[in-house]
Amino acid sequence: MASTTCTRFTDEYQLYEELGKGAFSVVRRCMKISTGQEYAAKIINTKKLSARDHQKLEREARICRLLKHANIVRLHDSISEEGVHYLVFDLVTGGELFEDIVAREYYSEADASHCIQQILEAVLHCHQMGVVHRDLKPENLLLASKLKGAAVKLADFGLAIEVQGDQQAWFGFAGTPGYLSPEVLRKEPYGKPVDMWACGVILYILLVGYPPFWDEDQHRLYQQIKAGAYDFPSPEWDTVTPEAKDLINKMLTINPAKRITAAEALKHPWICQRSTVASMMHRQETVECLKKFNARRKLKGAILTTMLATRNFSSKNPYKKPDGVKEPQTTVIHNPTDGNKESSESTNTTIEDEDIKARKQEIIKVTELLIEAINNGEFEAYTKICDPGLTSFEPEALGNLVEGTDFHRFYFENSLSKGHKPIHTILLNPHVHLIGEDAACIAYIRLTQYMDVNNMPRTMQSEETRVWHRRDGKWQNIHFHRSGSPTVPTK
């Protein structure tokens, strides 16, 4: 059926200057012609998006439509046109919260309390609506306007997910390194508490101008986070009230089940009794540290942008860290056209590609385990990795579709388990296609090395495709297709 090209955005809105840019999108100021009201239009080039990216875009729009709160950047319209999708948001003109703080003449604990209160109000609304943001960080905390006392607005729901109640599940490895929670780093089921951990990191920075977890080496940074290894060093923390430290401790609790919730945090004395509990003393040292923290965030962001534009990836740090200032170290950037080169240049880069790489590696690993079970003649181990309804096309079945594992039992009991000679298998050029969150397909060439009856080394080759499905957190092979040599080495 022929579809007419929608031009509703072009008809209803007038576009103006560029406000920002992403990999597949640009943000521009726009005006609704009928009302004269100004907005920010996120313009996504859908021609360049994969099916998975399309799903993410739909999810982001669906989530943003749900959220209507004074401390959240609101989505007003979502329009698809030929090759382009428009998301029309509030136009927020106050810039980043952290940039505004360093321009203030006066900044105290009480101000930090007011900032985190607004962030917590936004997080509470998200959680009440069944949304987990997953990427709370300074870059996503904006101010509604340049006016004094302008509202803090939570932005960028590109990584946000929908959850049912207090559901905990593995939703993928996503976020920004210094703000990731221990449960995400441990690849454990997670949910709303990940946002509260990030709030703890943000509050820590709001009070002293540097983050609780930092290391030049990303692996060591992750070890620190998993161990909850942060402290309140002198002299800067000596002037912070015990109540502020108590709230940070409750947010940076390793066990997510014991971590404070947004609703509980809003009832904490340091928040709800601010005027009598939070210190009013001006924190000049915090402002100075925060200036350096902001400068490095911007510099590293610029370096990353340049690297992405020029494809010049380097793992060396181009500048040294100023003494006495801590910062989180960044993410791995993968450039498919440039091999697996890595960069540790940006503190503020969101990771999701790392999750995709990890999931693909998981599929390769489970395929290797399955083949190891075949080579060792371990039928019980084989059936644990295979779905009971496994279907297959294989040379042994002479072109017939086989269902279940009983057909394979014969080979395990009469040939594979009887062989005492070593068998070695190599998977060449494995290609993994991820199909949503819980399904994947892997294609590869399988080389099997073995000793024949005359003790002569032999090699067999087969071409295989396996389809995997994850049930209850466990990958199972549901179908495979093999051509070429059979599984059992020929004599």
UniProtKB/Swiss-Prot annotation:
Active site, renumbered: 135 (proton acceptor)
Pfam families documented for this protein: CaMKII_AD, Pkinase
Stretches assigned to the Protein kinase domain: 13-271
Cited InterPro entries: Ca/CaM-dep_prot_kinase-assoc (IPR013543), Kinase-like_dom_sf (IPR011009), NTF2-like_dom_sf (IPR032710), Prot_kinase_dom (IPR000719), Protein_kinase_ATP_BS (IPR017441), Ser/Thr_kinase_AS (IPR008271)
Transmembrane keyword on record: no
Reported regulation of activity: Autophosphorylation of CAMK2 plays an important role in the regulation of the kinase activity.
Binding annotation for ATP: 19-27, 42
Comp. bias intervals (Polar residues): 328-338
GO molecular function list: ATP binding; calcium/calmodulin-dependent protein kinase activity; calmodulin binding; protein serine kinase activity
Complex and partners: CAMK2 is composed of four different chains: alpha, beta, gamma, and delta. The different isoforms assemble into homo- or heteromultimeric holoenzymes composed of 8 to 12 subunits.
Family: Belongs to the protein kinase superfamily. CAMK Ser/Thr protein kinase family. CaMK subfamily.
Name under which the protein is recorded: Calcium/calmodulin-dependent protein kinase type II delta 1 chain
Chain's gene name: camk2d1
